[in-house]
Amino acid sequence: MAFRRLKQVLRKRKLNHSGVTVDQQVNCVAYGARSGIWTICPDMLSSKSVIYSFGVGNNIAWDLAMIEHYGVELHAFDPTPRSVDWIGEQSVPQEFHFHPVGLCGFDGL
């Protein structure tokens, strides 16, 4: 815990030296596992929220945490065959919707 606080202080000091200041503090919570840990501001999330998650790969810990903690409807996207196969083997809640498509700068293949 002390290490995390030290990192925050050093990060804030570095930003201040660059001329960046914090105008407002927000409530932050981190969820996920391995390389998929993401920080969110949960204040406006509810069971009526819809989340779109892109490039899920084989790590849906963050996605499942959003459903578990906030009851959101979550749409996960990843076109890679490995991810499609892996997701197909998982037991996911009904609020989790997987789409085997991705984002690109153009339409088509």
What are these regions (language model features)?
Residues 1-109:
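Phosphate/nucleotide-binding beta-alpha loop and adjacent structural elements of enzyme active sites
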